[in-house]
Protein backbone atom coordinates (compact mmCIF):
# COMPACT_ATOMS: atom_id res chain seq x y z
CA UNK A 1 0.00 0.00 0.00
CA UNK A 2 1.26 3.49 -0.86
CA UNK A 3 2.26 5.81 2.01
CA UNK A 4 -0.15 8.50 3.17
CA UNK A 5 -0.51 11.62 1.07
CA UNK A 6 -1.39 15.23 1.85
CA UNK A 7 -4.27 14.72 -0.59
CA UNK A 8 -5.98 12.88 2.27
CA UNK A 9 -5.96 16.03 4.45
CA UNK A 10 -9.12 17.87 3.52
CA UNK A 11 -12.49 19.01 4.80
CA UNK A 12 -15.90 17.84 3.56
CA UNK A 13 -16.19 17.18 -0.16
CA UNK A 14 -12.51 17.99 -0.60
CA UNK A 15 -12.72 21.52 0.83
CA UNK A 16 -9.49 23.10 2.02
CA UNK A 17 -10.05 23.70 5.71
CA UNK A 18 -6.61 25.10 6.47
CA UNK A 19 -6.17 28.54 8.02
CA UNK A 20 -5.41 30.99 5.17
CA UNK A 21 -1.71 31.84 4.95
CA UNK A 22 -2.57 35.54 5.03
CA UNK A 23 -4.20 35.02 8.44
CA UNK A 24 -1.11 33.30 9.83
CA UNK A 25 1.19 35.95 8.41
CA UNK A 26 -0.77 38.86 9.90
CA UNK A 27 -0.95 37.16 13.30
CA UNK A 28 2.78 36.49 13.40
CA UNK A 29 3.55 40.04 12.30
CA UNK A 30 1.32 41.47 15.03
CA UNK A 31 2.91 39.32 17.72
CA UNK A 32 6.38 40.21 16.46
CA UNK A 33 5.57 43.90 16.83
CA UNK A 34 3.98 43.37 20.25
CA UNK A 35 7.08 41.54 21.48
CA UNK A 36 9.30 44.43 20.40
CA UNK A 37 7.07 46.90 22.26
CA UNK A 38 7.34 44.74 25.39
CA UNK A 39 11.14 44.51 25.12
CA UNK A 40 11.08 40.77 24.47
CA UNK A 41 13.61 39.15 22.13
CA UNK A 42 11.37 36.30 20.97
CA UNK A 43 8.48 34.09 22.04
CA UNK A 44 8.37 30.31 21.97
CA UNK A 45 4.80 29.20 21.28
CA UNK A 46 4.04 25.69 22.58
CA UNK A 47 0.38 25.67 23.58
CA UNK A 48 -1.52 23.51 21.05
CA UNK A 49 -4.24 26.15 20.71
CA UNK A 50 -1.73 28.87 19.92
CA UNK A 51 0.24 26.65 17.57
CA UNK A 52 -2.97 26.36 15.58
CA UNK A 53 -3.44 30.14 15.82
CA UNK A 54 0.03 31.03 14.53
CA UNK A 55 1.17 27.94 12.59
CA UNK A 56 -2.11 26.61 11.23
CA UNK A 57 -1.91 23.26 13.03
CA UNK A 58 -1.17 21.73 16.38
CA UNK A 59 1.71 19.41 15.56
CA UNK A 60 4.06 18.49 18.40
CA UNK A 61 6.70 21.20 18.47
CA UNK A 62 7.63 24.76 19.37
CA UNK A 63 7.19 27.86 17.23
CA UNK A 64 9.82 30.58 17.60
CA UNK A 65 8.54 34.06 16.76
CA UNK A 66 11.26 36.73 17.00
CA UNK A 67 10.47 40.34 17.81
CA UNK A 68 10.55 42.61 14.78
CA UNK A 69 13.76 44.24 16.03
CA UNK A 70 15.53 40.93 16.70
CA UNK A 71 18.39 39.91 14.42
CA UNK A 72 16.50 36.64 13.94
CA UNK A 73 13.50 38.38 12.32
CA UNK A 74 13.02 38.52 8.57
CA UNK A 75 12.96 42.32 8.86
CA UNK A 76 16.54 42.19 10.11
CA UNK A 77 17.66 39.57 7.61
CA UNK A 78 17.06 36.45 9.72
CA UNK A 79 14.95 33.36 9.08
CA UNK A 80 11.98 34.79 10.98
CA UNK A 81 9.28 32.63 12.52
CA UNK A 82 10.47 29.03 12.69
CA UNK A 83 8.45 25.98 13.68
CA UNK A 84 10.62 23.28 15.27
CA UNK A 85 8.57 20.08 14.93
CA UNK A 86 8.94 16.72 16.62
CA UNK A 87 6.09 15.15 14.68
CA UNK A 88 4.77 15.42 12.07
CA UNK A 89 7.04 17.68 10.02
CA UNK A 90 5.21 16.91 6.78
CA UNK A 91 1.80 17.69 8.23
CA UNK A 92 3.15 20.88 9.80
CA UNK A 93 4.40 22.04 6.40
CA UNK A 94 1.06 21.32 4.76
CA UNK A 95 -1.01 22.92 7.53
CA UNK A 96 1.12 26.07 7.45
CA UNK A 97 0.44 26.55 3.75
CA UNK A 98 2.98 24.27 2.07
CA UNK A 99 4.85 26.23 -0.62
CA UNK A 100 3.06 29.45 0.33
CA UNK A 101 3.92 29.19 4.03
CA UNK A 102 5.30 32.21 5.87
CA UNK A 103 7.13 29.90 8.29
CA UNK A 104 10.42 28.09 8.30
CA UNK A 105 9.70 24.50 9.36
CA UNK A 106 12.38 22.09 10.49
CA UNK A 107 12.92 19.06 12.68
CA UNK A 108 13.22 19.84 16.39
CA UNK A 109 16.89 19.61 17.37
CA UNK A 110 18.14 17.97 20.53
CA UNK A 111 17.09 20.05 23.52
CA UNK A 112 20.74 20.05 24.62
CA UNK A 113 21.68 22.21 21.65
CA UNK A 114 18.43 24.18 21.34
CA UNK A 115 19.86 27.36 22.87
CA UNK A 116 22.87 27.14 20.55
CA UNK A 117 20.56 26.63 17.57
CA UNK A 118 18.65 29.79 18.43
CA UNK A 119 21.86 31.75 18.95
CA UNK A 120 23.01 30.74 15.48
CA UNK A 121 19.72 32.11 14.14
CA UNK A 122 20.49 35.52 15.63
CA UNK A 123 18.67 35.29 18.96
CA UNK A 124 20.43 37.51 21.48
CA UNK A 125 18.38 37.50 24.66
CA UNK A 126 16.00 35.54 26.84
CA UNK A 127 13.15 33.61 25.23
CA UNK A 128 9.61 34.28 26.43
CA UNK A 129 7.59 31.15 27.21
CA UNK A 130 3.85 30.63 27.63
CA UNK A 131 4.18 29.92 31.33
CA UNK A 132 0.49 30.56 31.92
CA UNK A 133 -0.48 27.86 29.42
CA UNK A 134 2.06 25.04 29.56
CA UNK A 135 2.54 22.62 32.51
CA UNK A 136 5.04 23.80 35.13
CA UNK A 137 7.46 20.89 34.72
CA UNK A 138 7.40 21.25 30.94
CA UNK A 139 8.07 24.97 31.24
CA UNK A 140 10.89 24.41 33.72
CA UNK A 141 12.57 21.98 31.35
CA UNK A 142 12.63 24.60 28.61
CA UNK A 143 13.63 27.40 30.98
CA UNK A 144 16.67 25.33 31.96
CA UNK A 145 17.54 24.49 28.37
CA UNK A 146 17.26 28.14 27.29
CA UNK A 147 18.97 29.63 30.36
CA UNK A 148 22.21 30.38 28.43
CA UNK A 149 20.24 32.94 26.40
CA UNK A 150 19.22 34.90 29.48
CA UNK A 151 16.11 35.33 31.59
CA UNK A 152 12.88 35.16 29.61
CA UNK A 153 9.54 36.78 30.42
CA UNK A 154 6.10 35.19 30.29
CA UNK A 155 4.31 35.99 27.03
CA UNK A 156 0.95 34.46 27.99
CA UNK A 157 -0.84 37.77 28.48
CA UNK A 158 0.53 39.20 25.22
CA UNK A 159 -0.84 36.26 23.24
CA UNK A 160 -4.19 36.28 25.06
CA UNK A 161 -4.61 40.01 24.46
CA UNK A 162 -3.90 39.63 20.74
CA UNK A 163 -6.46 36.86 20.39
CA UNK A 164 -9.22 39.01 21.94
CA UNK A 165 -9.65 40.83 18.61
CA UNK A 166 -11.07 38.49 15.99
CA UNK A 167 -10.33 38.91 12.29
CA UNK A 168 -13.04 38.93 9.64
CA UNK A 169 -12.07 35.34 8.78
CA UNK A 170 -12.41 34.24 12.40
CA UNK A 171 -15.83 35.86 12.66
CA UNK A 172 -16.88 34.06 9.49
CA UNK A 173 -15.84 30.75 11.09
CA UNK A 174 -18.09 31.58 14.05
CA UNK A 175 -21.01 32.48 11.82
CA UNK A 176 -20.61 29.18 9.98
CA UNK A 177 -20.50 27.42 13.34
CA UNK A 178 -23.72 29.16 14.37
CA UNK A 179 -25.48 27.69 11.33
CA UNK A 180 -24.54 24.19 12.46
CA UNK A 181 -25.50 25.02 16.03
CA UNK A 182 -29.01 25.98 14.89
CA UNK A 183 -29.34 22.54 13.31
CA UNK A 184 -28.24 21.05 16.65
CA UNK A 185 -31.10 22.83 18.41
CA UNK A 186 -33.49 21.57 15.76
CA UNK A 187 -32.26 18.01 16.34
CA UNK A 188 -32.88 18.43 20.07
CA UNK A 189 -36.39 19.69 19.33
CA UNK A 190 -37.14 16.56 17.33
CA UNK A 191 -35.90 14.38 20.20
CA UNK A 192 -37.86 15.94 23.06
CA UNK A 193 -40.37 13.31 24.15
CA UNK A 194 -41.73 12.16 27.50
CA UNK A 195 -39.37 9.67 29.10
CA UNK A 196 -36.36 10.51 26.94
CA UNK A 197 -33.20 11.22 28.93
CA UNK A 198 -31.03 14.30 28.86
CA UNK A 199 -28.33 12.17 27.24
CA UNK A 200 -30.73 11.17 24.47
CA UNK A 201 -31.03 14.85 23.55
CA UNK A 202 -27.27 15.32 23.78
CA UNK A 203 -26.78 12.40 21.38
CA UNK A 204 -29.07 14.06 18.83
CA UNK A 205 -27.12 17.32 19.04
CA UNK A 206 -23.78 15.50 18.94
CA UNK A 207 -24.68 13.66 15.75
CA UNK A 208 -25.28 16.92 13.92
CA UNK A 209 -22.15 18.53 15.29
CA UNK A 210 -19.91 15.57 14.48
CA UNK A 211 -21.35 15.23 10.99
CA UNK A 212 -20.35 18.84 10.32
CA UNK A 213 -16.77 18.43 11.48
CA UNK A 214 -16.62 18.89 15.26
CA UNK A 215 -13.26 17.49 16.32
CA UNK A 216 -14.33 16.16 19.71
CA UNK A 217 -12.73 18.70 22.06
CA UNK A 218 -13.81 22.06 23.45
CA UNK A 219 -10.59 23.87 24.32
CA UNK A 220 -10.43 25.45 27.77
CA UNK A 221 -7.95 27.94 29.21
CA UNK A 222 -8.47 27.34 32.93
CA UNK A 223 -7.42 24.18 34.76
CA UNK A 224 -8.73 21.45 34.83
CA UNK A 225 -9.34 22.13 31.12
CA UNK A 226 -12.60 20.15 31.15
CA UNK A 227 -15.95 21.01 29.66
CA UNK A 228 -19.04 19.22 28.42
CA UNK A 229 -20.05 21.06 25.29
CA UNK A 230 -23.72 19.98 25.44
CA UNK A 231 -25.29 20.70 28.83
CA UNK A 232 -28.95 19.71 28.88
CA UNK A 233 -30.60 19.86 32.28
CA UNK A 234 -34.22 18.90 32.85
CA UNK A 235 -36.33 19.81 35.86
CA UNK A 236 -34.66 19.29 39.23
CA UNK A 237 -31.40 18.23 37.57
CA UNK A 238 -30.99 21.89 36.61
CA UNK A 239 -30.58 22.73 40.29
CA UNK A 240 -27.72 20.29 40.91
CA UNK A 241 -24.30 22.01 41.32
CA UNK A 242 -21.02 20.67 39.95
CA UNK A 243 -17.28 21.35 39.99
CA UNK A 244 -17.59 23.47 36.84
CA UNK A 245 -17.65 27.24 37.27
CA UNK A 246 -20.92 28.00 35.52
CA UNK A 247 -24.54 28.58 36.46
CA UNK A 248 -25.70 25.12 35.44
CA UNK A 249 -24.03 22.09 36.98
CA UNK A 250 -26.16 19.10 36.09
CA UNK A 251 -25.88 15.53 37.32
CA UNK A 252 -23.58 14.13 34.66
CA UNK A 253 -23.73 10.39 33.92
CA UNK A 254 -21.29 9.32 36.69
CA UNK A 255 -18.88 10.88 39.24
CA UNK A 256 -15.91 10.99 36.86
CA UNK A 257 -18.10 13.01 34.49
CA UNK A 258 -19.94 14.83 37.26
CA UNK A 259 -21.37 17.72 35.27
CA UNK A 260 -23.79 18.31 32.46
CA UNK A 261 -26.34 15.84 31.20
CA UNK A 262 -27.25 12.54 32.79
CA UNK A 263 -30.02 9.99 32.95
CA UNK A 264 -32.76 12.32 34.19
CA UNK A 265 -35.93 11.69 32.18
CA UNK A 266 -38.00 14.45 30.62
CA UNK A 267 -41.33 15.23 32.27
CA UNK A 268 -44.27 17.46 31.43
CA UNK A 269 -44.29 21.14 32.36
CA UNK A 270 -40.65 21.11 33.48
CA UNK A 271 -37.98 23.53 32.21
CA UNK A 272 -35.47 21.83 29.93
CA UNK A 273 -32.38 24.01 29.62
CA UNK A 274 -30.34 23.29 26.49
CA UNK A 275 -26.86 24.86 26.38
CA UNK A 276 -25.02 23.87 23.21
CA UNK A 277 -21.49 24.61 22.04
CA UNK A 278 -20.33 23.95 18.51
CA UNK A 279 -16.72 24.28 17.38
CA UNK A 280 -16.22 25.00 13.69
CA UNK A 281 -12.62 24.69 12.48
CA UNK A 282 -11.49 25.49 16.00
CA UNK A 283 -13.87 28.38 16.74
CA UNK A 284 -16.45 28.24 19.53
CA UNK A 285 -20.04 29.46 19.50
CA UNK A 286 -22.20 29.11 22.60
CA UNK A 287 -25.98 29.48 22.97
CA UNK A 288 -28.80 28.40 25.30
CA UNK A 289 -32.51 27.98 24.67
CA UNK A 290 -35.35 26.58 26.78
CA UNK A 291 -37.57 23.64 25.87
CA UNK A 292 -40.62 22.11 27.51
CA UNK A 293 -43.26 19.44 27.08
CA UNK A 294 -46.74 20.88 27.53
CA UNK A 295 -45.61 24.39 28.39
CA UNK A 296 -44.28 26.10 31.51
CA UNK A 297 -46.02 27.95 34.31
CA UNK A 298 -46.37 31.72 34.22
CA UNK A 299 -43.77 31.94 36.99
CA UNK A 300 -41.15 30.20 34.87
CA UNK A 301 -42.03 32.33 31.85
CA UNK A 302 -41.70 35.48 33.95
CA UNK A 303 -38.25 34.36 35.08
CA UNK A 304 -37.19 33.82 31.47
CA UNK A 305 -38.50 37.24 30.47
CA UNK A 306 -36.54 38.79 33.32
CA UNK A 307 -33.32 37.08 32.20
CA UNK A 308 -33.86 38.42 28.69
CA UNK A 309 -34.06 41.89 30.23
CA UNK A 310 -30.84 41.27 32.16
CA UNK A 311 -29.16 40.02 28.98
CA UNK A 312 -30.30 43.12 27.10
CA UNK A 313 -28.83 45.35 29.82
CA UNK A 314 -25.45 43.62 29.65
CA UNK A 315 -25.39 43.69 25.85
CA UNK A 316 -26.26 47.40 25.82
CA UNK A 317 -23.55 48.16 28.38
CA UNK A 318 -20.85 46.35 26.41
CA UNK A 319 -22.09 47.88 23.17
CA UNK A 320 -21.61 51.44 24.40
CA UNK A 321 -18.09 50.66 25.58
CA UNK A 322 -18.53 50.18 29.32
CA UNK A 323 -15.92 48.16 31.17
CA UNK A 324 -16.86 44.50 31.55
CA UNK A 325 -16.95 45.01 35.33
CA UNK A 326 -19.51 47.78 34.81
CA UNK A 327 -21.64 45.48 32.64
CA UNK A 328 -21.51 42.91 35.46
CA UNK A 329 -22.61 45.54 37.97
CA UNK A 330 -25.51 46.67 35.79
CA UNK A 331 -26.73 43.14 35.05
CA UNK A 332 -26.30 41.69 38.53
CA UNK A 333 -27.90 44.69 40.25
CA UNK A 334 -30.87 44.49 37.88
CA UNK A 335 -31.30 40.79 38.66
CA UNK A 336 -31.05 41.49 42.37
CA UNK A 337 -33.69 44.22 42.11
CA UNK A 338 -35.96 41.60 40.54
CA UNK A 339 -35.50 39.41 43.60
CA UNK A 340 -33.03 36.93 42.12
CA UNK A 341 -29.94 37.70 44.19
CA UNK A 342 -29.76 34.19 45.65
CA UNK A 343 -30.50 32.43 42.35
CA UNK A 344 -28.50 34.31 39.71
CA UNK A 345 -25.92 32.01 38.06
CA UNK A 346 -26.51 29.31 40.66
CA UNK A 347 -27.69 28.98 44.24
CA UNK A 348 -25.68 29.76 47.33
CA UNK A 349 -23.05 28.61 48.16
CA UNK A 350 -22.37 27.51 44.56
CA UNK A 351 -23.07 30.68 42.60
CA UNK A 352 -20.85 31.72 39.71
CA UNK A 353 -19.94 35.40 39.61
CA UNK A 354 -20.10 36.25 35.92
CA UNK A 355 -22.70 37.00 33.27
CA UNK A 356 -20.65 36.48 30.13
CA UNK A 357 -17.38 35.00 28.88
CA UNK A 358 -15.33 35.70 25.78
CA UNK A 359 -15.04 32.90 23.24
CA UNK A 360 -12.75 32.14 20.32
CA UNK A 361 -10.49 29.13 20.04
CA UNK A 362 -11.27 28.52 23.70
CA UNK A 363 -14.57 28.58 25.56
CA UNK A 364 -13.29 30.62 28.50
CA UNK A 365 -11.31 33.45 26.97
CA UNK A 366 -10.93 36.94 28.42
CA UNK A 367 -12.33 39.41 29.23
CA UNK A 368 -15.27 38.20 31.32
CA UNK A 369 -18.39 40.07 32.43
CA UNK A 370 -17.38 39.96 36.07
CA UNK A 371 -15.95 42.05 38.86
CA UNK A 372 -12.28 42.93 38.29
CA UNK A 373 -12.36 43.10 34.49
CA UNK A 374 -11.99 46.86 34.35
CA UNK A 375 -11.72 47.18 30.59
CA UNK A 376 -14.19 47.16 27.72
CA UNK A 377 -14.76 44.44 25.18
CA UNK A 378 -12.65 45.44 22.18
CA UNK A 379 -14.09 45.95 18.71
CA UNK A 380 -14.32 42.51 17.06
CA UNK A 381 -14.26 40.95 20.52
CA UNK A 382 -16.69 38.05 20.89
CA UNK A 383 -18.64 37.35 24.06
CA UNK A 384 -21.23 34.78 25.14
CA UNK A 385 -23.78 36.54 27.38
CA UNK A 386 -25.65 34.06 29.59
CA UNK A 387 -27.76 35.23 32.54
CA UNK A 388 -29.40 32.19 34.12
CA UNK A 389 -31.42 31.42 37.23
CA UNK A 390 -31.16 28.26 39.29
CA UNK A 391 -33.80 26.94 41.71
CA UNK A 392 -34.30 23.63 43.48
CA UNK A 393 -36.88 22.61 40.90
CA UNK A 394 -34.97 23.66 37.79
CA UNK A 395 -33.08 26.33 35.91
CA UNK A 396 -33.89 28.83 33.19
CA UNK A 397 -32.09 31.46 31.15
CA UNK A 398 -30.86 32.60 27.79
CA UNK A 399 -27.49 32.75 26.07
CA UNK A 400 -26.16 34.01 22.77
CA UNK A 401 -22.75 34.77 21.33
CA UNK A 402 -22.23 38.42 20.36
CA UNK A 403 -19.55 40.41 18.54
CA UNK A 404 -18.68 44.00 19.43
CA UNK A 405 -18.70 46.35 16.42
CA UNK A 406 -18.32 50.09 16.08
CA UNK A 407 -22.12 50.24 15.85
CA UNK A 408 -22.61 48.17 19.01
CA UNK A 409 -23.16 44.49 19.73
CA UNK A 410 -24.36 42.13 17.00
CA UNK A 411 -25.59 38.61 17.61
CA UNK A 412 -23.60 35.78 16.05
CA UNK A 413 -25.78 32.87 17.13
CA UNK A 414 -29.55 32.32 16.97
CA UNK A 415 -31.46 35.38 15.74
CA UNK A 416 -34.89 36.67 16.73
CA UNK A 417 -36.55 34.16 14.41
CA UNK A 418 -35.65 31.39 16.85
CA UNK A 419 -37.92 31.24 19.89
CA UNK A 420 -36.49 31.65 23.37
CA UNK A 421 -38.61 28.74 24.55
CA UNK A 422 -39.78 25.85 22.40
CA UNK A 423 -42.79 23.83 23.51
CA UNK A 424 -42.58 20.34 22.05
In which residue ranges do the predicted regions lie?
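Active-site neighborhoods and metal-handling regions in enzymes and metal-associated proteins
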Residues: 1-424
Amino acid sequence: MAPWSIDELHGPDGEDWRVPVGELESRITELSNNLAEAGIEAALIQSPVDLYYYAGGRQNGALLIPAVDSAASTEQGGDGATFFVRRSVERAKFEAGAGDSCLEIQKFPSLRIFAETLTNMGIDGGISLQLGEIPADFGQKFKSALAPLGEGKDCTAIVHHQRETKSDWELEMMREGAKVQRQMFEAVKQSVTLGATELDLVAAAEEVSRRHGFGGTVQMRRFPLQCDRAVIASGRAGGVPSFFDSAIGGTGPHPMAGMGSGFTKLEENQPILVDLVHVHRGYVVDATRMFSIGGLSERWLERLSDMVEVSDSVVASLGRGDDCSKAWQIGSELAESMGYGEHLMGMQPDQSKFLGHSVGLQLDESPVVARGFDRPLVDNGVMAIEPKLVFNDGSIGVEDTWVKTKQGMKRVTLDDSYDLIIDC
